Regions:
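Membrane-embedded alpha-helical bundles that constitute the cytochrome b-like, heme-associated redox core
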Residues: 2-206
Length: 206
């Protein structure tokens, strides 16, 4: 019985496809697991958030231009991390899943808290950009990266500045609520919630 002729791809096309697959495998092999990456992101963002809650540009100005540039550079790092976190969420959704011991109301709160934190971080980055956009002078993060072309909108700049400040305080409240929720889970439900994001070195204390 005659067989249908096999459809063979050209050698060049096969080589390109194989190379792409190998390159993709190599790249993904060297990328950290998503949970590991988020854990690193989590503990990188937290100290920066605390820093910007406690220290304002006016606090560092008396220490000279170098101190101000360092403060500004930390802001650039913070914004970059916020945008990476938001991009990961938009691409792949929430990485965190509610544990099986959570009641229905806690499952809903779990999702709401995590989503609000991500959009809160994005909001801080956005209003930071608006501050640069409405400024009368060109602002550069860390003296390196321009914020945006300055439009010199004094009134809008004042509004953006106020929103930016209140966003930080609101974000701090969300962080406290987030931490309190997971501490409650860990102690009351005994579901080891704190071990999810805590470094392994601390697991024996939790």
């Amino acid at each position: 019985m005659p067989h249908a002729p096999a459809i063979n791809l050209p050698d060049t096309q096969l080589c390109k496809s194989t190379r792409r697959q190998r390159l993709k495998a190599v790249l993904f092999a060297h990328l950290p697991h998503r949970r590991s990456a988020l854990k690193a992101l989590h503990w990188s963002v937290l100290p920066l958030l605390i820093w910007f809650l406690l220290v304002t540009p006016s606090d560092v100005l008396p220490f000279g231009p170098t101190a101000f540039q360092i403060h500004s550079l930390l802001g650039l790092v913070f914004v970059t991390l916020c945008l990476l976190w938001t991009a990961g969420y938009l691409r792949r959704g929430l990485a965190s899943r509610p544990g099986p011991k959570l009641p229905l109301w806690a499952r809903r709160l779990h999702r709401w808290l995590h989503t609000a934190l991500i959009w809160g971080l994005f909001g801080v980055a956005l209003t930071g950009f608006l501050l640069g956009l409405t400024s009368a002078t060109l602002l550069k993060a860390g003296g390196i990266l321009p914020f945006a072309p300055p439009l010199g909108l004094h009134g809008a700049n004042q509004i953006a500045g106020q929103i930016h400040i209140y966003e930080f305080y609101l974000l701090a409240l969300l962080v406290v609520a987030h931490a309190g929720f997971h501490i409650w889970r860990h102690l009351r439900l005994r579901d080891n919630a704190l071990r999810i994001m805590a470094p392994k070195a601390l697991h024996r204390f939790l």
